[in-house]
Amino acid sequence: MAYRLITQVVVVGSRVLGRAFAEAYKQAAASSQYQRAQQKNGNAATGRASLTSGMTLDEACKILNVNKPADGTAANMEEVMERFKRLFDANDPEKGGSFYLQSKVVRARERLEAEIKPKMEEKQAEEEVKEGWNPKIYKDR
């Protein structure tokens, strides 16, 4: 009689684990399919940043209380860094803050940096091309 009970527990347990693994696989497949679709649509930077930080651009903007970066300007980055420093210090665990909130603030900054920096670099490259190449010539006396 005990062997029947043990066998039944093993069978039911394996069914539960099998279903859990199947569900986890479905979720992972759907997530990777979504990321591939994002990259195909031209949101490659968005997809990469979302993968690394696990946060959307809207969520990052809400956490740091900044507007969405329309164009990658230094002013946007300065505002992001200002808000980041203030919120990071306010949520310091040694001062009674929350480590979880502090990590969310860090992830939000990383997400916004991933969005703004490529635009800033592109702008700088365009400005350099516009100005032309001006080598520095050193004259001896």
Curated annotation (Swiss-Prot):
It comes from the Eukaryota. It is found in: Mitochondrion inner membrane. Residues 119-141 are annotated as: Disordered. It is a peripheral membrane protein. InterPro entries: J_dom_sf, Tim16. GO terms for cellular component: PAM complex, Tim23 associated import motor; TIM23 mitochondrial import inner membrane translocase complex. Pfam families: Pam16. Its main location: mitochondrion. GO terms for biological process: protein import into mitochondrial matrix. Keywords: Membrane, Mitochondrion, Mitochondrion inner membrane, Protein transport, Translocation, Transport. GO terms for molecular function: protein domain specific binding. Gene3D superfamilies: DnaJ domain (1.10.287.110). Residues 59-117 are annotated as: J-like. Essential component of the PAM complex, a complex required for the translocation of transit peptide-containing proteins from the inner membrane into the mitochondrial matrix in an ATP-dependent manner. In the complex, it is required to regulate activity of mtHSP70 (hsp70-5) via its interaction with tim14/pam18. May act by positioning tim14/pam18 in juxtaposition to mtHSP70 at the translocon to maximize ATPase stimulation. Heterodimer with tim14/pam18. Component of the PAM complex, at least composed of hsp70-5/ssc1, grpe/mge1, tim44, un-4/pam16, pam17 and tim14/pam18. The J-like region, although related to the J domain does not stimulate ATPase activity of mtHSP70. It nevertheless mediates the heterodimerization with the J domain of PAM18 and is therefore essential for PAM complex function. Belongs to the TIM16/PAM16 family. This is Mitochondrial import inner membrane translocase subunit tim16. It comes from Neurospora crassa (strain ATCC 24698 / 74-OR23-1A / CBS 708.71 / DSM 1257 / FGSC 987).
